[in-house]
């Protein structure tokens, strides 16, 4: 009955590739680098994924940026920490959803913390989804892509997997 707690972790390389894709999308939205620079960064990271780790760290990005002569040498990797965090959270959520689908979980409940203020975009999602049961495939992935300036969306939205017959 509770076999979904023993699902094996997905291939770490696949998770890292998802994270690279998400980082590429978020960086394009943030406009901190040009599309050409972002493309080179993503290409380098795909070619040289981090070994023995399940996510990207600043050193990986720094090494990739060092290979691109179009990026100023004084570019600080710390300036894209938020984008890296969002990419990591989104990739982790995608892997988690894939595991949930494999074990038959089809519905989730999205809970926003009432004591926090959310950005305008997240407020719309809050009105639509807060506390409601939604199909897993229809639920948005938090943090939203547009919320790279909003810390509340990355930390204070909880997506709970629901088991039919127990939770709903």
Give short role names for the model-derived ranges.
Residues 1-151, 159-168:
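Domain-core detector
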């Amino acid at each position: 009955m509770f076999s979904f707690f023993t699902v094996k972790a997905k291939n770490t390389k696949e998770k890292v590739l998802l994270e690279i894709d998400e980082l590429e999308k978020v960086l394009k939205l943030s406009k901190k680098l040009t599309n050409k620079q972002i493309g080179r960064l993503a290409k380098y990271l795909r070619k040289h994924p981090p070994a023995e780790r399940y996510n990207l760290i600043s050193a990986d990005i720094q090494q990739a940026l060092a290979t691109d002569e179009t990026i100023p040498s004084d570019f600080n990797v710390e300036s894209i920490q938020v984008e890296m965090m969002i990419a990591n959270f989104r990739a982790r959520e995608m892997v988690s959803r894939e595991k949930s689908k494999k074990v038959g979980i089809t519905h989730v409940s999205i809970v926003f913390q009432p004591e926090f203020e959310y950005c305008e975009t997240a407020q719309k999602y809050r009105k639509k989804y807060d506390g409601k049961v939604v199909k897993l495939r229809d639920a948005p992935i938090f943090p939203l892509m547009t919320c790279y300036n909003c810390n509340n969306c990355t930390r204070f939205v909880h997506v709970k997997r629901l088991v039919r017959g127990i939770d709903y």
